[in-house]
Amino acid sequence: MKTLNRRDFPGAQYPDRIIQFGEGNFLRAFVDWQIDLLNEHTDLNAGIVVVRPIATDFPPSLNTQDGLYTTIIRGLNEQGEAVSDARLIRSVNREISAYADFDAFLRLAHNPEMRFVFSNTTEAGISYHAGDRFDDAPPVSYPAKLTRLLFERYQHFAGAADKGWVIIPCELIDYNGEALQALVLRYASEWELPQAFITWLTSANTFCSTLVDRIVTGYPRDEVAALEAQTGYKDAFLDTAEHFYLFVIQGPASLAAELRLDKLPLNVRIVDDIKPYKERKVAILNGAHTALVPVAFQAGIDTVGEAMNDAEICAFVEKAIYDEIIPVLDLPRDELVSFASAVTGRFRNPYIKHQLLSIALNGMTKYRTRILPQLLAGQKAHGALPPRLTFALAALIAFYRGERDGESYPVQDDADWISRYQTLWARHRDGQMSTRELVTAVLSVADHWQQDLSQTPGLVELVTADLDAILTCGMRDAVKPLC
């Protein structure tokens, strides 16, 4: 069986127009996959040069396959049907190591056709590294590397206003474009680069903040033989991802035409502010996960997919989304309903086995950031606590007992919470503390909740009643009235 290369598998090639910091699975099944579709169906005509931003030889370079690789996109489509689509990605031209070939890295700035910079250098990538110097070849941090590359471009084109770049980071931090720009400006200042360059940075370049959403499951180790039998070639860079994707870019409206999204819209939104979309994702997708986990797990279920195939648990989650979360969010209802429908479809994806215990990590913080705002907004709007979001809090407290059907399971959270719960549940088991006292002790940790939740009218009473029901009747019977 042949290995992928451009000689044996000839096809379209595109001129270098995009620099991409990061060679990982996510960008390849998200940004590069979208660029490849735009290249095929529009006149975008943009090839990608991947920059490996760290000093490592693992994984091997994409150059071993001439930049070619396959994405396998699978899940439930908009009609609820299971689909699996293989696509040979031809838009990556080559990979460069910023460490092994620094001169080639700098020469990317000399190409007049270069226009876009994408990146995913992990959440820690957009950060300041105190030791970075202009003369380093290269500097350590991604923002410092980008500053050096931008200065190279500024010098090469004598500060031409039309040679700036559109910079679109995909790192999972809030307002990533603004954070990246601030660090680039900091390095430019600390390195005492000319004021004219600093002016050019802000006037000729556009830094866009983004929200990215797609579960990328990466190299399908257990299925490689079967998948390569289908494609007919060996591919060391096979990349799998879910069917759903969403790319929200905070930037000028003109960006839609420049990326040819006017000719092939994809699920990309060019917006003035990503904040409402971030809130929607956190509240609906992440919030539903956080509400689901302690309820489903204590009902004897182990994965998200199994939970969504359980009629009662599925009903609980969907009612929480549609009746308690969506009504308090600040976006058009039809948009929210459409997004929620996609979310529940994603949860049902038969190709992804999402373990509930893996999502349970840091559940206390997740509840505070993902569910509590909607719980309090619902109470304010309707004068009553939303029953399912409140029940989810009781289920979360019960989850921290660390035991299901007589079997212990790992609970992963901040050490303070682990210690606190061990003490509280031990005292409760020994009859030294009532359920109400336990609930009050949890809700009154103001440092965590950023307020004393035990003072929220009715919350202690309702959570106590729910927790008593869980402890007395078991999760199945306790949750039934809310399904």
UniProtKB/Swiss-Prot annotation:
NAD(+) binds at residues 18-29. It holds the Pfam family Mannitol_dh. Pathway: Carbohydrate metabolism; pentose and glucuronate interconversion. The keyword Oxidoreductase applies. It catalyses: D-altronate + NAD(+) = keto-D-tagaturonate + NADH + H(+). GO terms for molecular function: mannitol-1-phosphate 5-dehydrogenase activity; tagaturonate reductase activity. GO terms for biological process: D-galacturonate catabolic process; mannitol catabolic process. It comes from the Bacteria. GO terms for cellular component: cytosol. Belongs to the mannitol dehydrogenase family. UxaB subfamily. This is Altronate oxidoreductase. The gene is uxaB.
